[in-house]
């Protein structure tokens, strides 16, 4: 069987996993399509052992379709609009991201956790959940088990945030503006930010959803410096190894070019919008990006050892809980310092 046919067969398989996961995600946005895709892939992997006809396509989807999805994510970012509307939230965003990443780094060292899993949980918790994990995973060369663990942890605390935060905000007396900032800076995934803000609006007959979404988009911009920083760190490590082994390392081979394409897509979106192009024009690209992420998560699920995931998932959950609590406290603390709450 030719390699092209193997790739096509694997792509079709991942598409068939992504399709029901996509519709399940639409029906249950708190869970989200990527989580459904991972679990469907893991369930199928229990029975689907002989993969010689699809292995190449599964590997292609988990790597290159994921990178393609990240590039398309850039078409959802109008840099000027996000920076203009979201600049009031920048101090809170910087504080929450910094504290979460620092905590993830310290806990990884303290408890000797897996470096990649700690990085993905830290980035996913502090920036934008599954999208940040999708952008970061190829940069640090994370494997399927590490990605699946991280996505699962993010999913758990997304649900908790959507269930708890509206009541918590009510109890501590947050204003509508304050809750929009809280939801946008302390909830991981965009769909969960939407669900959390919608729950608040249902209780208060308000409209915090737009504000929370803009704050969330502003927070998403942190993908750029974080992934670039991790990229240069990976280059540094690779060069160090290459020097020890007496061979040179070419920057182009280890630097993830898809991150630069992501930035380029964001710049194109910003320029075209400034020239009068309707933002609706980019909606199909954003939707395609989300679906490609779901396909990639299905492929990752197929390559994930569910037994290992269950056995080693405890550490990731503790790390995720720690990051989630710190982000919540820092978000509220910064609002208090800034006189918003």
Swiss-Prot record:
Membrane-topology descriptor: Multi-pass membrane protein
Coiled coil: none
Taxonomic superkingdom: Bacteria
Subcellular location(s) of the protein: Cell membrane
This protein's record includes keyword Transmembrane helix: yes
Keywords linked to the UniProt accession: Cell membrane, Membrane, Transmembrane, Transmembrane helix
UniProt key word Membrane: yes
InterPro entries associated with the record: UPF0324_pro
Membrane-traversing stretches: 7-24, 28-47, 68-85, 90-107, 120-142, 147-169, 178-200, 211-233, 254-276, 291-310, 317-339
SS bonds (residue pairs): none
GO CC annotation, single: plasma membrane
Entry's family note: Belongs to the UPF0324 family.
Name recorded for this polypeptide: UPF0324 membrane protein SMU_2059c
Protein's organism: Streptococcus mutans serotype c (strain ATCC 700610 / UA159)
